[in-house]
């Protein structure tokens, strides 16, 4: 089963951007974690990161066309991008929204995600373990 792991703006800066909020794991470490977890679960993991909303929309459309599951960390786009929300609504397979930090324990403007309403589930505040949990959930659903 193919699973897209898609990451939005600034996630390529993991490890150096606000480590007190996002931890010290680098983006390269996150990629390896997702690939390793995918191998253990028999998943084909396609992992991507972008700072360009248009690019993320294209990847979501690709996943929708293929009927692929998605693990999505929309980052800042969670809070205001109706375009990302609408692209997620096109998905025919499960979508798990992931956030490294607990968005409900941060600034007020981060408390609401427009994506959550169309997600199968949401994992937040568990750091990079959230990605591992999302992949395990999708693998279990496929059985």
Curated annotation (Swiss-Prot):
Binding site for substrate: 73, 79, 86, 100-101, 110
An annotated GO BP: amino acid biosynthetic process
A single MF term (Gene Ontology): 3-dehydroquinate dehydratase activity
EC code: 4.2.1.10
Catalytic reaction(s) noted: 3-dehydroquinate = 3-dehydroshikimate + H2O
Involved pathway(s): Metabolic intermediate biosynthesis; chorismate biosynthesis; chorismate from D-erythrose 4-phosphate and phosphoenolpyruvate: step 3/7
Active site: 22 (proton acceptor), 99 (proton donor)
Cytoplasm as UniProt keyword: no
InterPro entries for this protein: DHquinase_II, DHquinase_II_CS, DHquinase_II_sf
Keyword line: Amino-acid biosynthesis, Aromatic amino acid biosynthesis, Lyase
Family matches, as Pfam families: DHquinase_II
Site (Transition state stabilizer): residue numbering on this chain: 17
PROSITE patterns (alphabetical): DEHYDROQUINASE_II (PS01029)
Positions of transmembrane segments: none
HAMAP family cross-referenced by the UniProt entry: AroQ
Function: Catalyzes a trans-dehydration via an enolate intermediate.
Family to which the UniProt record says this protein belongs: Belongs to the type-II 3-dehydroquinase family.
Subunit-level organization: Homododecamer.
Protein's name in the database: 3-dehydroquinate dehydratase
Organism: Salinispora tropica (strain ATCC BAA-916 / DSM 44818 / JCM 13857 / NBRC 105044 / CNB-440)
Taxonomic placement: Bacteria, Bacillati, Actinomycetota, Actinomycetes, Micromonosporales
